[in-house]
Regions:
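A glycine-rich phosphate/pyrophosphate-binding beta-strand-loop-alpha-helix module
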Residues: 58-116
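Extreme N-terminal cap/leader segments of soluble proteins
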Residues: 1-54, 71, 80, 98-113
Length: 116
């Protein structure tokens, strides 16, 4: 893929279409925020960022979730920034997004957005 942001068609086809999402405001083109329903009692919002350089994309998601859970927080959503080398193909992108989507669905934590 070429350097820079993904084209809108690749974003829709290889990222947004794959995400299992139960967020109140799901990710979309030009949407720079996400929303979850946190009305079940008093809520404190926390955030965690974890870099993943592996060929095992789930590891980065689980590392970030682990940091939140160990601090006593209940994760309500996932945001991600995906930086791929120019040698990556659209199939590589799809594989990463598919892995993140599997974690999202398994852990019942929606993907709220991110940057690609």
């Amino acid at each position: 893929m070429k350097a820079g942001k993904l084209s809108e068609s690749i974003l829709k086809r290889s990222v947004l279409r794959q995400l299992h999402n139960s967020a109140v405001r799901a990710p979309g083109v030009g949407i720079d925020f996400g929303a979850v329903d946190a009305s079940a009692g008093k809520q404190i919002v926390t955030a965690e960022a974890c870099r993943a350089f592996d060929t095992f994309p789930e590891a980065g998601v689980y590392a970030a979730l682990n940091n939140l859970v160990c601090s006593g927080a209940k994760p309500l959503g996932i945001t991600m920034t995906l930086l791929l080398p120019t040698s990556a193909s659209e199939n590589d992108l799809r594989a990463w997004i598919s892995a993140v989507s599997r974690v999202s669905e398994k852990e019942q934590i929606p993907v709220l957005g991110g940057h690609t």
